[in-house]
């Protein structure tokens, strides 16, 4: 994970000085992301949370991005809710919001805009795509009236998920507080730490389902190979004899090697004396 951290997040800035108040605020923010993603079924699985500054970030939560062939509306909403978990935690448990959520707000707004303008997931503009592949065009492919509807729908989606994030954090405020304190003390926590505090997730992630399915297929493949492999008792006598001689030769060679090693060790010991 250290190599991935350096590539994705940049080098650690251990010399960056923070007050305990700033450090606690960042811990509460990152614990907010971790808590929301833990209780949102379709949020990417959590791997690690840190409040050690890297690059431009003062803290970060690392997830396993799930490579989905398609993405449902529920999955998009869970990701937006998870992104807003840090800002929601600041409002609820710090009592003041900060600029630390800027990247989260940018990503959640872009995701909501994509749902409304590109993938037809809006209640007021269903099944409509306003995507314009002319990157040099200064004209939007919709009217001012539609632009107002898009703005309103983006705002509604973000606000709804922000309220949802605050509700989840309120329901699990004790777990969040314990998580934030552990993060404040240790600076880095992992999935196992989150599971000890918040309990096992009531569902498996898509990544976990794919891993289990792959393990099942591998087990079936091995069982079939074992079943198709010729058994010793079914082999001709000459093959059985050759197999036995081969195994005996390996055993003899191993024994001789061990004897040579013991002899050399004894000779070395006598020389020292």
For the regions a protein language model found, what residue spans apply to each?
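P-loop NTPase nucleotide-binding/switch module
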Residues: 5, 9-20
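Soluble catalytic regions of large protease machineries
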Residues: 20-28, 34-273
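C-terminal helical "lid" of AAA+/P-loop NTPase domains
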Residues: 1-3
């Amino acid at each position: 994970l250290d190599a991935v951290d350096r590539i994705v997040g940049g080098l650690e800035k251990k010399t960056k000085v923070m007050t305990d108040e700033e450090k606690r605020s960042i811990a509460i923010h990152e614990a907010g992301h971790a808590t929301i993603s833990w209780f949102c079924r379709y949020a990417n699985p959590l791997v690690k949370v840190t409040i050690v500054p890297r690059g431009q970030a003062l803290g970060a939560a690392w997830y396993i991005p799930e490579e989905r062939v398609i993405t449902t509306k529920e999955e998009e909403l869970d990701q937006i809710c998870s992104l807003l978990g840090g800002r929601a935690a600041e409002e609820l448990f710090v009592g003041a919001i900060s600029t630390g959520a800027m990247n989260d707000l940018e990503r959640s707004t872009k995701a909501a805009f994509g749902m409304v303008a590109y993938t037809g997931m809006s209640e007021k503009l269903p099944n409509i795509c306003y995507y314009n592949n002319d990157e040099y065009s200064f004209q939007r492919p919709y009217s001012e009236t539609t632009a107002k509807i898009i703005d309103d729908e983006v705002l509604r989606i973000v606000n709804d998920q922000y309220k949802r994030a605050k509700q989840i954090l309120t329901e699990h405020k004790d777990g969040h507080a314990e998580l934030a304190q552990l993060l404040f003390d240790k600076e880095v926590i992992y999935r196992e730490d989150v599971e000890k505090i918040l309990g096992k997730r009531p569902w498996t992630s898509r990544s976990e389902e794919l891993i289990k399915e792959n393990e099942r297929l591998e087990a079936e493949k091995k069982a079939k190979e074992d079943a198709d492999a010729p058994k010793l008792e079914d082999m001709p006598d000459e093959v059985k004899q050759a197999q036995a001689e081969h195994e005996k030769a390996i055993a003899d060679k191993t024994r001789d090697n061990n004897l040579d090693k013991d002899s050399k060790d004894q000779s070395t010991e006598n020389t020292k004396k």
